[in-house]
Amino acid sequence: MFVMVLRIILLALFAYCIYAVVKYVANPKRRLKLAQSKEHFYIIDEQNNTRKNFQLTYKGVLFEGEKHIPSKDHPLFIHTIFVWTESPEKLKHFSAKDFENIEEKVLERYPNCKIDWDQPIKLAKKAEER
């Protein structure tokens, strides 16, 4: 009887370990940080939730986008997206093409929206366009 209970406990412990590993590997925040460290593109977004901001990383810079809806009548229609970064000093290496790529990726998800950039990003875009 004791051996049977011990086997059940070990089986439950093994199942919990597998669950914890899968949950860790599938964590989107961990995947975002990994993509940021490898300077890849990755986006975390809940398209059905208009109140939740999205995060994206591109070339090692983490951006955040705030979705704006025009009125409460259309809760699923995104009108404007305001994008900013906490580290504008990393934008020195960005070209105008990089900002266009980010806009394309966002517009793939929200085709009828206008993208507003934060002031440091606007300045970096204008400096690159000159």
UniProtKB/Swiss-Prot annotation:
Major subcellular location class: membrane
Q: Which UniProt keywords apply?
A: Membrane, Transmembrane, Transmembrane helix
Q: Which GO terms describe its cellular component?
A: membrane
| Record bears the keyword Membrane | yes
Expression is induced as follows: Expressed under the control of the sigma-W factor.
Question: What parts of the sequence cross the membrane?
Answer: 2-22
Q: How does it sit in the membrane?
A: Single-pass membrane protein
The lineage's top-level taxon is: Bacteria
What does the UniProt entry say about where the protein is found?
Answer: Membrane
Disulfides per UniProt: none
Biological function: May mediate a negative feedback loop that down-regulates the expression of the sigma-W regulon following the activation of sigma-W in response to conditions of cell envelope stress. Might interact with and inhibit the activity of the protease PrsW, or could bind to the anti-sigma-W factor RsiW and thereby protect it from PrsW-mediated cleavage.
Q: Return the protein name.
A: Sigma-w pathway protein YsdB
